[in-house]
Amino acid sequence: MKILLADKQDITRAGLTYVIEKMEGLETKYVEDKTELMLALRENEDTVVILDYTLFDINDSAELLILNQRFPYTRWLLFSEDLSADFVRVLIASSSMFSVLLKESPLTEIKEAIRFCVDRK
C-alpha cells in the first residue's frame, strides 16, 4: 500500500519514509500540496495520508472534512506538534477515518498508528 506523505518538513518526511519502507508491504509518496494530494487520491483513494495539517495548504477543518467526504476510503493520520483541542474534536466527532499522533510520540507508537491506519478499512 502507498502512504501519502503530506508534510513539508524535510526531516520528518525522511524519517517517515525510512520507518514506513521498513514495514512490510508499504511504500511512500510525497505530495507537495493540496492539488497534488487530490490527484494522488483520485488515482487510489484507498490509502493513508500522513498529514501535518499546520504546515500544509489546507485552510481549516471544514476543508479537511470536505476532502474526507470526497475520498471516503482514505484514512487520515494527522501528524503534528500543535493541533488545537477544538480542531481535533471536530474531526474525530465527524469521521472515524481520522487519527491523531503527536510528532513527539515514541517510534513504537508511530509505527503502531501507521499500522492501525493501514489495517483499518
Residue ranges and their predicted role:
Residues 32-48:
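Acidic, metal-coordinating helix/loop segments flanking the phosphotransfer/catalytic sites
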Residues 87, 105-114:
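C-terminal output helix
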